[in-house]
Regions:
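A short, basic N-terminal segment
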Residues: 1-42, 86-89, 175-181
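P-loop NTPase nucleotide-binding core
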Residues: 35-164, 184-187
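Conserved catalytic/switch belt of AAA+ P-loop NTPases
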Residues: 161-182
Length: 190
């Protein structure tokens, strides 16, 4: 008996995305066509088991392959904070360094008294818009950030309004640079 390769499991990518190619092509074309391309802003809807999460995963895979940064999240409490954290991760900074005397007898012994301590870098709380704009500065011309937000129907309207507003302003900020659309650092959202 041959096993069915299609196992409808939450988020599991099937071996074939039947009937989805036009949507995938629209998204891919949106990434390629530069700022303002309609395929860059999508809302995937459907009943439970339709494959919405799979489509978002496919968009993320496609964007990554084309050199875009991808932030994939689920619309739940703290959505905007998690996006800011993903875009502007905190690193470590040198908190203090103490270089003390060093003693060495070649071939016999050596000693050094010194220490360094590190702490998480202190970072001002970034707004979502600031975090996106800062990250875009690091992206290659014509590339940008793809946001895939799963379970958007269950999101707090406040989170979705905050995200939509930030994206709208970032797109406008890019327009104010007088850079050709094909070279602008863009945003895509699904």
């Amino acid at each position: 008996m041959t096993q069915n390769p299609f196992k409808p499991t939450a988020g599991k990518i099937p071996p074939l995305l039947i009937g989805r190619q036009p949507i995938i092509d629209d998204f891919a074309e949106g990434l390629e066509n530069g700022a303002g391309a309609p395929g860059r802003l999508m809302l995937i809807t459907g009943q439970r088991g339709y494959g919405k999460t799979v489509m978002l995963s496919e968009f993320a895979r496609l964007a990554t392959a084309q050199g875009w940064t991808v932030v994939s999240e689920t619309a739940s409490f703290g959505l905007c904070d998690r996006i800011v954290a993903a875009l502007a991760p905190q690193g470590l900074k040198l908190k203090s360094a103490n270089i003390g005397p060093s003693f060495s007898i070649p071939g016999i012994a050596s000693a050094s008294l010194g220490a360094a301590s590190f702490a998480p870098s202190e970072q001002c709380a970034l707004t979502l818009r600031e975090a996106i704009n800062q990250r875009l500065k690091k992206e290659a011309p014509g590339k940008g950030i793809v946001f895939t937000i799963d379970e958007a129907q269950a999101a707090s309207p406040d989170y979705m309004v905050a995200l939509a507003t930030a994206l709208q302003h970032v797109i406008r900020d890019q327009d104010l640079t007088n850079t050709p659309d094909s070279e602008k650092k863009g945003i895509a959202f699904a």
